[in-house]
Amino acid sequence: QVLGELDQFPTLDGSFSLHSSLFCEAFHNSAGALNEARAKFVRPAEVQRFKPDHTLRVLDVCFGLGYNSAALWDSLSGQTSRMQWWGLEIDTRPLRLALADTGFINHWTHSTFNRLRSLDQCSEWTDADGQGTLFWGDARQCLDNIPEEQSFDLIFHDAFSPQRCPQLWSE
């Protein structure tokens, strides 16, 4: 149990989040995991600035329940952009808990759900719009699995707070 005990709780936007006993902190604020993903990650990403034929390269550090990437994927639904996606996560339980929750599943398009399910089952997804790989383990070591020359258009860094998890906030 890498993140300690995980307690599930509802948030005000109808999504759910988890509280980690190890870090004594919730994954999301009580206003809503889905709202937080859209406000802190998807909107600031300004994906419309990329040309339609551009392959979007994304790194999601501390993938957790998957809200941030799933919200991004849904925001791109129907666009011509392709994606190369990498995720890093230390604990398999958050994604499994998310995929066991009907409310969580109902937030997403069919293609986004398929990506999440594929990440849970085989740590990667491939579809007509791109491909993705999720590396399980400590993000600091998992970065070595990504080619050194790889650059990213977007990096989602969603670790616990620097006070609770300073190892993922060092320079």
Predicted regions and their residues:
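Rossmann-like AdoMet
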Residues: 1-56, 73-105, 130
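Short C-terminal domain-edge/linker segments immediately following a structured domain
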Residues: 47-51, 115-121, 165
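S-adenosylmethionine-dependent methyltransferases
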Residues: 54-55, 112, 153
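Short beta-strand immediately N-terminal to the catalytic nucleophile in serine-hydrolase-like folds
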Residues: 59
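Conserved glycine-centered beta->alpha loop in an early N-terminal alpha/beta scaffold
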Residues: 62
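Glycine-rich SAM-binding Motif I of class I
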Residues: 65-70
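S-adenosyl-L-methionine
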Residues: 97-146
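Active-site segment flanking the S-adenosylmethionine/decSAM binding pocket
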Residues: 131-171
